[in-house]
Amino acid sequence: MIRNPMSDIDAILITGPTASGKSALAVELARAHDGVVVNADSMQVYDTLSVLTARPSETDMEGIPHHLYGHVPAGQAYSTGVWLREAAALVAQLREEGRTPVFVGGTGLYFKALTGGLSDMPDIPTEIRSRLRERLLAEGTDELYRELVLCDPTAAESLSSQDGQRIVRALEVIEATGQSIAAFQGKTGPVIIDADRARKIVVLPDRAVLHQRINGRFEKMLAMGAEAEVKALLALGLSPEMPVMKAIGVSQIAAMLRGEMTRAEVLDTGAAATRQYAKRQMTWFRNQMDESWERVSP
């Protein structure tokens, strides 16, 4: 139980590393504040990977409404901007109903966008987006990066030559608008959540406890059907550059399906990758979340 609940709040924000117990805390606080849980994790939006992304089950939800989970097809382009628009519409609806949105997830950028706004990026025609993503798959990042250097050197200088998703995004913007993506990144859209009227919690467990949870969790995921999920995902034939293909466990389980890894190796490498990801999250939260965020160690 979290101590010292605040009064007169209109939103609750909960973040923390993977396997920290934040989803259960969200349900607890949603129940206490007549709230609704809203996903703020960039991988839990996809419909294909329920087990592998640790999306809350019906049992986990305990009868509390949960939104923005599993509603995006794996092959569909999805961005922080799209999530923010969906979150804004949901917050407006919940405020009309007098209910408290309880945002929970490990994607730090989502929380920064909620409370600080996001660059007002232009809409990209589907034809342009599809064509460039097909080119990324067919030609690779090096070729598209060389093209970006020629047409938008400012954007190219700020990106890794191997960051396929961001290279494509920059090319999309300049083709659709004739302007560099940098011109839009300086324009900030509306703030959805007033940080001063939100209860903000970052869950930071003891490292040893977190590692123990992660080790057991990955094994449980395999037992619950993660292998079948990855098999279904691979059957879609998506580009390896699509965000959903980069979910932790996908590459390891795919290797097992190809006969290149044993189950034991999948457990070891999957858990190791999850621990590394949790470490990066912990570092980011400690550096980015100021003193207004309540630190909790479960």
Curated annotation (Swiss-Prot):
Transmembrane segments: none annotated. Its cofactor is Mg(2+). The record marks 107, 129 as: Interaction with substrate tRNA. GO terms for molecular function: ATP binding; tRNA dimethylallyltransferase activity. The keyword tRNA processing applies. Monomer. NCBIfam families: miaA. This is tRNA dimethylallyltransferase.
